[in-house]
Amino acid sequence: MLKHKIIGLDVGSKTVGIAISDLMGWTAQGLDTLRIDEENNELGIEALVKIIKRDNVGTVVIGLPKNMNNSIGFRGEASLQYKEQLQEALPSLEIIMWDERLSTMAAERSLLEADVSRQKRKKVIDKMAAVFILQGYLDSLQ
């Protein structure tokens, strides 16, 4: 059993998908999608801090998009900057960067297989990608 819950984040330029673990550390569930504006540096950090405190979160796993050759591109750099901003807001929080290659594609594929409409997919894809990121991390702990 975990002392604190773990959340997973899929950070995009317009949204941050959020997933949360159970206290056993076995499963990840979609929690929320924050609207952000990366261009204007409105990253939703304050809203995320409230969620972290409200849900007794001790660890945050942020998806790190890497290129297939293992290099870090523009989106990866943006995720690393997001980590720095969150760490500034909560210095004692454990933040782990997790290779998220293909997590959004896997989420999209599973939603397509479930015959979810395009409009509904658009609403839940980031949260679902966060579930894939967090579940991958949780599975690595077992």
From Swiss-Prot:
InterPro entries named in the record: RNaseH-like_sf, YqgF, YqgF/RNaseH-like_dom, YqgF/RNaseH-like_dom_sf
Keywords: Cytoplasm, Hydrolase, Nuclease, Ribosome biogenesis
Protein location: Cytoplasm
The enzyme's E.C. designation: 3.1.-.-
Coarse class of the protein's main subcellular location: cytoplasm
GO biological process: rRNA 5'-end processing
Gene3D superfamilies assigned to the protein according to its UniProt record, in alphabetical order: YqgF/RNase H-like domain (3.30.420.140)
Domain of life: Bacteria
SMART domains from the UniProt entry: YqgFc
GO molecular function terms attached to this record: nuclease activity
NCBIfam families the UniProt entry points to: RNAse_H_YqgF
Family as reported in the entry's similarity comment: Belongs to the YqgF nuclease family.
Protein name (record): Putative pre-16S rRNA nuclease
The species this protein was found in: Staphylococcus saprophyticus subsp. saprophyticus (strain ATCC 15305 / DSM 20229 / NCIMB 8711 / NCTC 7292 / S-41)
